[in-house]
Amino acid sequence: MALTMSAKSVSARAQVSSKAQAAPAVAVSGRTSSRVMPAPALAARSSVARTPLVVCAATATAPSPSLADKFKPNAIARVPATQQKQTAIITGASSGLGLNAAKALAATGEWHVVMACRDFLKAEQAAKKVGMPAGSYSILHLDLSSLESVRQFVQNFKASGRRLDALVCNAAVYLPTAKEPRFTADGFELSVGTNHLGHFLLTNLLLDDLKNAPNKQPRCIIVGSITGNTNTLAGNVPPKANLGDLSGLAAGVPAANPMMDGQEFNGAKAYKDSKVACMMTVRQMHQRFHDATGITFASLYPGCIAETGLFREHVPLFKTLFPPFQKYITKGYVSEEEAGRRLAAVISDPKLNKSGAYWSWSSTTGSFDNQVSEEVADDSKASKLWDISAKLVGLSA
């Protein structure tokens, strides 16, 4: 069911992966980080082989003994199939929406959460801080800004023998004040490369695992954003999302052409565009795979999490004024904990098991299947997006 690796693309990227240190297979007591290339560090690339001058590599530094003793990361472990609970992979589960969704699922006692994160120690500290029970979660390294890391994650997960009942694509980067683009290990603009392309590869490589879910109700959830929905007031705040003719993406969103529409770089728009791409991907997956696999594909906007770490790179004045504005003016404010419960419901609630849905919430009616923007609903453009994305990540139909 998963798309197959393009031999030409694999060969082109082999030079990169052979130089980069492989991601750790199990958790270690250390802090893992990734280096992101600035534009000047990029070498010239073609649309087929884009080998960056600097390779993103995982590095680890040992924490102090006291921290290592206190926070021992829970590596994913083999458990007999008959003893396994329902399993959900959540990307970006070390903070914010992802962490609180993991907490809500773990609290049911019916789910095991695989926290797919870049930093083992941060994830372990976060899980302990919110009180996730021991044995209810494990941590597996994933850096979505590296396609090699995505493939290594999938290999490690499959080797664990874990079942997969839900895949939640939540992790995202948002660089609203960036004046110059940043790039992934594979040479893609960072927001598009991480938020869209990294998740695109991850979902395709795990489709067969989801299809074979023992609970017979597998779900693939990709988090969207109201800022990418031009049907809303928030979605019409400039710069508005617009993928244009996808010429920038077709070129690989490189240093010379870093926006999906081929226009001048704008950090806030790059994030919005990536979320439009995520929502279009959900619709494509629903149309291509739902009937044959039974997998439920859905996206959601859980509400305005005005105090999320996603805004860490915004200007201080915005971070001060935005939460009260959402609480008292728009009334759209939602806490990280409540947003996490909503995401957990989309993962597990039988009433929200609708493929192709874009879930939103209102204060009066609760959850509802919302209308997507005209661009997200453009299936012809979405099909083109799919084909380009598959080529960029090394997959073929």
From Swiss-Prot:
Pfam family, one: adh_short
Subcellular localization, as worded in the UniProt entry: Plastid, Chloroplast
Pathway: Porphyrin-containing compound metabolism; chlorophyll biosynthesis
Family annotation (CDD domains): LPOR_like_SDR_c_like (cd09810)
InterPro entries: NAD(P)-bd_dom_sf, Prochl_reduct, SDR_fam
Record keywords, A-Z: Chlorophyll biosynthesis, Chloroplast, NADP, Oxidoreductase, Photosynthesis, Plastid, Transit peptide
Residue range covered by the transit peptide: 1-57
EC number: 1.3.1.33
Catalyzed reactions: chlorophyllide a + NADP(+) = protochlorophyllide a + NADPH + H(+)
Enzyme class name: oxidoreductase
One GO MF term attached to the UniProt entry: protochlorophyllide reductase activity
Chief localisation class: plastid
CC annotations in GO: chloroplast
GO biological process, one term: photosynthesis
Similarity annotation: Belongs to the short-chain dehydrogenases/reductases (SDR) family. POR subfamily.
Function, as annotated: Phototransformation of protochlorophyllide (Pchlide) to chlorophyllide (Chlide).
UniProt protein name: Protochlorophyllide reductase, chloroplastic
Species of origin: Chlamydomonas reinhardtii (Chlamydomonas smithii)
Top-level taxonomy: Eukaryota, Viridiplantae, Chlorophyta, core chlorophytes, Chlorophyceae
